[in-house]
Design a protein with these regions (language model features):
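N-terminal signal-anchor/signal peptide hydrophobic helix marking the start
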Residues: 2-8
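Alpha-helical transmembrane segments of integral membrane proteins
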Residues: 12, 89, 93-126, 142, ...
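Hydrophobic alpha-helical transmembrane segments of multi-pass integral membrane proteins
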Residues: 13-18, 56, 60, 101-105, ...
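Membrane-water interface segments at the C-terminal ends of transmembrane alpha-helices
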Residues: 18-26, 51-54, 65, 133-161, ...
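Transmembrane-helix boundary motif in ABC transporter permease subunits
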Residues: 20, 24-25, 76-79, 103-135, ...
Length: 315
């Protein structure tokens, strides 16, 4: 476990360090953006509080020290006003995580039976039609689905709200209505990817000798599927789903702005366009941290789903 986590921690460290160094290359310096005019003592105090009183590496380690202690920096307004990034995260992050969880639930509920069906009908007409459709869906960016769904389903047909977000604590039914279109926008290409992965693994499992032997013993197709085929075949699917959690959080950047959902993706967009680079650095670091966490969790889960995975790691 430790051997797998340590390299991922270097990913977090490296990605945030590179971003921090890139911030030093901005045409407008960070000092010009965030330091309010004042006397020398006031300016020096502001520089020290933001870690801008040294070189690029001093700035990075000042930020990193604050980040690991839960201080994600500040959103700095013209004139020197500040708002802790944690205030925005406390509302935006749960919304994005809720969206990602919904997407994963929908994607897995659809892709697992779809992948099994196409695997058992491999080479037939229905398999070819579904496979070509899935390939096309996987090739289209999720924001294209978002725009199409918002325009046709939300605006022209008026079946669902094209914009806005209602918290589940206020009205759960309206919450579900406002989440359907953004969830579908992210879920459609995800379903395509998951289904194709599971289809390939199920086809490979069906060709294994132990499956042929189980069939020769008279075991039912249902028992063969759930006992001998689906369990080892789900390894790649679960791995992909876990790794995709971080990608989905990044994918919410455009989708949340299309549907006016006040999540982490929207906050990243706001930080970019309003040049709130301290907040942006913390947002990207959090996505990297979630990526590491999901990798660690899936590493443990795969050991239970497929013991061969654990044996290969311990070999």
């Amino acid at each position: 476990m430790l051997k797998r986590v340590v390299p991922l921690l270097f990913v977090v460290f490296g990605s945030t360090l590179i971003l921090s160094l890139l911030l030093q290359l901005l045409p407008v310096g960070l000092k010009d953006l965030y330091i309010a005019p004042g006397d020398e003592a006031s300016v020096n105090e502001q520089l020290k509080s933001l870690g801008l009183d040294g070189n690029a590496f001093t700035f990075y380690f000042h930020w990193l020290n604050d980040f690991v202690r839960g201080n994600f920096g500040y959103i700095i307004f013209p004139g020197g006003g500040r708002e802790p990034v944690s205030n925005r995260l406390s509302t935006a992050l749960p919304i994005s995580l809720r969206l990602v969880v919904y997407v994963q639930i929908v994607a897995l509920l659809v892709s697992i039976p779809l992948g099994i069906y196409t695997a058992y009908r491999a080479g037939r007409r229905s398999d070819r039609v579904i496979s070509y459709s899935l390939f096309a869906a996987a090739s289209i960016p999720n924001f294209v689905f978002g725009l199409l769904l918002a325009i046709f389903v939300g605006v022209q047909l008026g079946w669902l709200p094209p914009l806005g977000y209602v918290p589940p604590s206020e009205d759960f039914v309206e919450h579900i209505k406002t989440m359907i279109l953004p969830v579908l926008s992210l879920a459609i290409p995800t379903i395509a990817t998951y289904s194709r992965l599971l289809r390939s693994d199920v086809i490979a499992a069906l060709r294994e000798d132990y499956v042929t032997m189980a069939a020769s013993k008279g075991l039912s197709n249902r028992r063969i599927l759930f006992t001998h085929v689906l369990r080892p075949s789900s390894t790649t699917l679960f791995t992909s789903a876990a790794l995709n959690m971080g990608a989905l959080i990044g994918g919410t950047l455009v989708i949340e702005q299309i549907f006016a959902i006040p999540g982490l993706g929207s906050e990243i967009g706001i930080a970019i366009f309003s040049r709130q680079f301290f907040a942006l650095q913390s947002y990207i670091a959090l996505i990297a941290v979630f990526y590491v966490i999901f990798n660690g969790v899936i590493d443990v889960v795969l050991g239970f789903v497929d013991p061969r995975t654990r044996e290969r790691r311990n070999a």
